[in-house]
Structures are given as C-alpha cells and as structure tokens.
Amino acid sequence: MQDSLSIDQARRVVLAAQQFHAAPASPKSASALAAIVRRLGVVQMDSVNVLVRSHYLPLFSRCGPYRRELLEEAAYEPKQRALFEYWGHEASLLPLESYPLFRWRMERARRGEGTWGRLKRFVTEHRETVAAVLEQIRERGPLGAGEIAGASRGPGGWWGWSESKEILEWLFWTGQVTTARRRNFERLYDLTERVLPSALLAQEVSKEHAQRELMKISARALGVATLRDLRDYFRLPTQDAAQRLKECVEEGELIPVTVEGWKQTAYRHRDATCPRAVSASALLSPFDSLIWERQRTERLFGFHFRLEIYTPAHKRQHGYYVLPFLHEGRLVGRLDLKSDRESGRLQVKGGSVEAGVKESTVIEPLREELSSLAK
C-alpha cells in the first residue's frame, strides 16, 4: 500500500479495520462474539437504555442479529469467560488477555494521579470504611453497591449507598475488585482473584510495554489514524502516547502516511488492508468505536455528530438517541430511535439524510436494517 491515501482509500482502510468489510454472519457461540471484540480491542458500555444497552449494538452493526446471551456468556460465565470489564476507552468490555496491559492504569489510580485524585482523597479519609467494604465482598461477594450500604460501621457511624458506590469505584479502578456479573445491568463486584484466572493476574508487564501494546491494538483496529486518534482509543496519557507512537514507528509496526485533506501526519498499521469496496449497511451506536473521536469522524466522513442526550429538548438538532447510518462506505443519514418495550415495537422518532444524498438510494437498505434491528 502506498504512503499516500485518498480520503476514499482511507475510509476503506478504516472500515476494513473496524470489521465492516465482510458480509454479516451471525455468531453462533460466545467465543465467536469474543473474537469480534478481540479484533476491535474494546467495546464501550453505557447505562443509557433507550434502544438497547450500547455494548450490544456494535456487534449487531458488524454481524447482524445474534443472541445477546452469547455476549453475556463471553463476559460473565466463568467457564466461557473471554472478556472482562474495565476502563478501556470509557467503561468497556475488553479481551481477557489484555488485562495485564491495564495494570499501569490501576497503579495510577492507586496513587491518585490525574482524574483519580478526588477518589484517592475520599478513600484516604475513609480507610476503615474501605477495609470494611472489602471485607464484606471477601465474605459475601459478589455484591452490588446497594447490598453493602449500611452493612457495617466505620468510625463515623453507618455509611450510605453513595459512599459505598465511591469506595467500590475506587476498588474497581485499582483492580482489587472486578465485575463478576451483572444483574439488570447493576455491577456485582467480587475480588478480582476469584473472578479472573490466576495465571493472567500473575503476568507482569512494564508500563511502557503495556502502552506500546495498546497503541498497536488501537492501530490495528483503526487502520489509519493520527496520534490523537490512536491516543483516544484507550485514553492514553498525551506525552506517553507520543513516545509509544515513536517506538511503534521505529519497530515498523506503524508507517507514516499522508491522507487527503488531513493536516496531521497519519499512521497506517503495517497489516492494514484497503478493499476495493465496502458495501456494508449498518446503524451505528452513538458509542461505536468507528465514531468515538468526533473530529476523526468529520475528517473521514464529513459527518458532524454529537450526542444530544444531555442537550435540552428544544435545542436538539437531530434527536435524543441518534444512530448514524453507514451505507456503502459513507455515513449517509441518521435516525432517532427508541424501543417501546410495552408494545414491543421499534419507534422511529425522526431521521434525515445528509446533504447531497438521495433518499431513494438509502430507503430500502435502511428499511432492511430497521427490520433486522426490530427483531
């Protein structure tokens, strides 16, 4: 592949890397679903449930209808567990084998660096309470936050649900507990050593090696990307990301390229492919890794996308829960969707096509996607 890409070539490289190049094939096993997550490196989770929990949608977008129970098995069934929860991009499902690559982040949290400073101060002021919560999990886990609240007494008396939640977040960030399973999407926490394989927990890797591996995973999943794009995928520290990128280039894993219309230098993964065409049609979760980095989405697709869930209704441009529509290598429209669980119907609250796109060219593939999603 040449060291200069047209914007159309860049889109095809990216879509192939993000697993949109092959014809949808419904996974029949938990391991098959986990393999897709492994190729993406990470799938974001979110509590918003207007349509469906967000972590189910990226897999649907790439492989069509599948049994959601299979993803639950891959994430939480002890004998089939191939995924774990941690802060990858945001709250995420990650391939089990990547657990050691996040230990540096757990150590940063333990030291209270950066965004963890507030939690560190909180647990420092509540040491005995933290110890009591951890002991309860050891004795009775897995437990949800509500099952711990007020269950023991610290030096200041009974503590409440919000304090338990803060403590559990701290224990989760630092790797002392993890998600054993979910109950109506509520995390049930247990000691990490009781959930994940001991051989995995025994692996030690340096911060530099771990970040370098995360950079490579990002590059494989993105195909071609700028430093900003690569850093954002796993939210690496800015200075560390720049150094890891330099090392990956020196190793030959990443190749500097120019992309039509991009001001910044781009980097192509050495194994990236550029298919002749990408014919996929897919509705995308607002939390899909293809469109995480909003500036990247505009650079690649000329598509301005912002999440409007927290925007007052009268100020929204497109709707509350809007899914971009990918068709034949372009983002051609968007739909505001909602699941009416009482009637069992999929509601289309609104929609539009992008400027220059003929409605007649997208109506039929969009209808097919909606029909598939409604199942």
Locate predicted features.
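Long, charged, low-complexity, helical-prone intrinsically disordered regions
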Residues: M1-K375
